[in-house]
Amino acid sequence: MPITYVSGDPLLTRSPMLAFGHNAKGRSELGALETSLLNRYPAAFATYGKNCRSGRIKPGTFWAWRESKPSLMFMVIRETSVGATRVRFVESAMMTLARDYRLYDLTSVAIAPLTNTLEWKALKPVVDYWLRASPLPVAIYEAYVPGVAAEST
């Protein structure tokens, strides 16, 4: 199924899984979307941080929290909260998602903006390469617009 690129508020998605980029240290990030996610799902972030501090979460992987609607997928694409998003980590996470989505019982995924606009130009071809051939329906948010539902998520 093709990838759909949308703009809007990922928190309003109808997809059962919301994926977003995060760091391997489990530290809070300061963007508007990250702050909204942290305020809405504090238990998910606390558990994720605990797993990071214990060394169970590595860059290039993802970790799922299924105790919310939508479920949350922390895509570990940065080593630290102030570090750059690494192409190799994005590639690894996308490859795993495209290959193993059935193991995680995923029927569709909405992916929140993974990084800033400048980094996204380099990452979009990588994301597209790994997800376009997958039968998993994917909606990728290119721009975060608070309070606005995307048309096809």
Model-found features: residue ranges?
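Macrodomain-like recognition of ADP-ribose-binding/processing modules
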Residues: M1-T153
